[in-house]
Structures are given as C-alpha cells and as structure tokens.
Amino acid sequence: MKILITNGRVLDPAHGIDEKFDVLIEDNRIAQVGTDIQTADAEKIDAAGCLVVPGLIDIHVHLRDPGFEYKEDIESGTRAAAAGGFTAVACMPNTSPVNDNKATTQYILHKAAQAGHAKVYPVGAITKGLKGESLAELGDMKQAGCVAVTDDGHPVSHGEIMRRALEYARSFDLPIVSHSEDLSLVGDGVMNDGFVATELGLRGIPWVAEVSAVARDVMLAEYTNARLHVAHVSTRGAVEIIRAAKARGARVTAETAPHYFTLTEDAVRGYDTHAKMNPPLRTSDDLEAIREGLADGTLSVIATDHAPHHPDEKNVEFNLALNGIIGLETALPLTLRLVEEGALSLSDAIACLTSGPAAALSLPGGTLEVGRPADVTIIDPEIKWTLDPQAGQSRSRNTPFGDWKLKGRAICTIVDGRITYRLSD
C-alpha cells in the first residue's frame, strides 16, 4: 500500500527538518521525503495547513490489561492513543498479574498485535510483584520484548535493591524508569502540602518527598553508570537535580506530564477528584520550573501517565478517590498551548512527543528518516474544539479538562503505513 502526503509542513526535530515537503509511504516504510513527489497508485492525503510529524510516542501509559479491563484494555487504550495522534505507547506493569515475567509480556504483545491501533511496548517490573523485595527476571523480560523496567505506582524504597537493579539492568542496556517518591514523607497525604491543602482540610504531600527520592536515584544511576529515566517530574527541586546531573554527564533522562505544566494545586479546590493524581499537582512556581525544564532540555519527554479509572473510583470523597487521570487524547493540544504561550518552540514541543521519548527508551520511532517504519501523525494546529469526556475513545472518563476549549488536534494517525485513525471516522 502506498500513501502520498502532500502540501504539509514536515517537522522532524531529530533531523532538523522544518520544510514544506511531500512524504511518500510504501511497503510500511518512509520511502521518500521531498518536493513534488510523483507516484502512481497511491492514496493521497492533502495536508495543506497541517503539520506532518513523526508518529507521537507516549512512554508512560496504564493500559490496565491484564486484570483491570473494566477501566481500560489494550484495544480501547490503543484506540484512544491513535485518536490522540500516538502511534506507539509504552505500558506500565502494575496490572494483575504484574508484568514481571516473560509470559505476561508475551500476552501484552499478542493482544496489541490483534488490536492494531498503535504499537505497544511493554515495560516490565523491577521487582517481583512490585513488592520491592527481590529483582524480577529482567533479562527474560527484555528478551520477550520489554523496553524498560519500573515499579511505577510504587517506589523501590530500599536503596540497595535499587542499586542492584541499576547494575543488573545496565548489563542488558535496559533503562530503569524511576517512580521517585519517599513514602515515609508522603504518609497519608492526598494533595500538595501547602496553603491550599490547609484551606481544604486535606493532608499534604511535601515537595521533598519527590525531590529526595529523585536525588537518591540520580546518584545511584551515576554510581552504577546505568540508564535512569525519571517519571512524572512535578517539582522545581527535581528539575534542578536532573539538570545538574545531566550537566555532569549522568545517563539520566526525565519526563513530565501535561497536567504538571497546565494545572496547579488550585484545581483541587471544590474537592475535584479529577485533579487528584500522584505526584500531586503542585504550585505555580513548580509549574514554571517544569516549563523551564522542557525549554532547556532538562525534561526531554512529555508523557501522559494515562491512568483510567471507573467512575465509581472517582465519584467518592477526595480522600478515598484513586489517583490518576486519562490523557492520551488531550496531551497534544495541551502541549501546543505551550507553543502558543511562547513557553516552548514548536520544534521542541514535537521533539518532546517524538524523538525525546524514542531516545529515552531506545525505541525505533521518532523520526521520518527514509527507510524507517512509516509511523506518521498529521496535525491540524489551528482546529478549535471542546473536550467532551463522554466522546473519548478510552473506556474511562476521568479527566480534569472536560469542557476545555482546545486548539490543535491529530487528524490522521498512520502506523506502519496503515491509517489507524482519521478525525472524520
């Protein structure tokens, strides 16, 4: 099958390309990128006024499958991904059973191949059962198809176990994704510690719970010379630690999520459980630090931490509500808001959704280089729309952005040369 995309603004940050080019896809690969491409028997897509970029990649997604399919499954989650412009996602291992073994990894890959909406890269567990006690079989999981390991949802609290995990993972060149959190400091907190928490009568989570854990994990990564990717950064202190570590040459990358550069703890006012996540929404100063970190490359990845929940798990009092929000269909327009507000260049914004995540986990996408897999996202940056949570592709509806007026949207998603989403579909 051939697809010829014409008249679009081709933006490939990995190769410094920002030109009005055509893109020819043939035999599931990028066959040609250039001007006035001529070919017969190709499906033509006129991308006038649109951006043509490498397929977006989200390296922090909870697909809830196996075990929690009432919230999301691989089919619905990848459908939501495609609708958001993502051609690939990396799924977290906190499922039931936990993805701490070869068999569960193979199950995920098999089901993802059947769904076909987006590529799925499994992330295995660092420790067996996510219990933080003994290391999982990292080598077996990598051989089965895992691209990284994490105990996401739980920190690896024991420093020696984290050290051994980094050393073991280094032998396979496998990135460790760190959920950096000191549970002894978190206690029974449910939102950011500060004035708003006091005003609402809710127990707070201090910023130092994240920052101290990031500091430990970064130092362990330097000590072991292992690859570390810091997940869902939400605080100024964490940004500063990561910036300094990268300047020293540490093998550290880091991500943040759209809610951390869009919302602050003020969103919790009214006890809105859709504004409850872990780590919690922070202060306006933290938000500015996150934006600065994206602009200077300290944070090279924007990932959603897409965390679907059933309404019964959110429509309860704030203290009892589960943490997390969905984000696959809102990440792109929220990122484009940063561009419109002058906080991030368009090229850097697209890089944080493409080449940045690909580099962090050594994934094959993130570029429109000739010969590479034909994973392409076409974006209309000017389209205006209002988010209706009930109209989303995810099985869950837990978003704090309901009824927000957004600008910019994926209008076509192409995975391995197959169109998996059109806005008109």
UniProtKB/Swiss-Prot annotation:
It catalyses: (S)-dihydroorotate + H2O = N-carbamoyl-L-aspartate + H(+). GO terms for biological process: 'de novo' UMP biosynthetic process; purine nucleobase catabolic process. It comes from the Bacteria. Zn(2+) 2 binds at residues 152, 179, 232. GO terms for cellular component: cytoplasm. Its cofactor is Zn(2+). Its EC number is 3.5.2.3. Keywords: Hydrolase, Metal-binding, Pyrimidine biosynthesis, Zinc. SUPFAM superfamilies: Composite domain of metallo-dependent hydrolases, Metallo-dependent hydrolases. Zn(2+) 1 binds at residues 60, 62, 152, 305. Substrate binds at residues 62-64, 94, 278, 309. Pfam families: Amidohydro_1. Catalyzes the reversible cyclization of carbamoyl aspartate to dihydroorotate. Belongs to the metallo-dependent hydrolases superfamily. DHOase family. Class I DHOase subfamily. This is Dihydroorotase. It comes from Syntrophotalea carbinolica (strain DSM 2380 / NBRC 103641 / GraBd1) (Pelobacter carbinolicus).
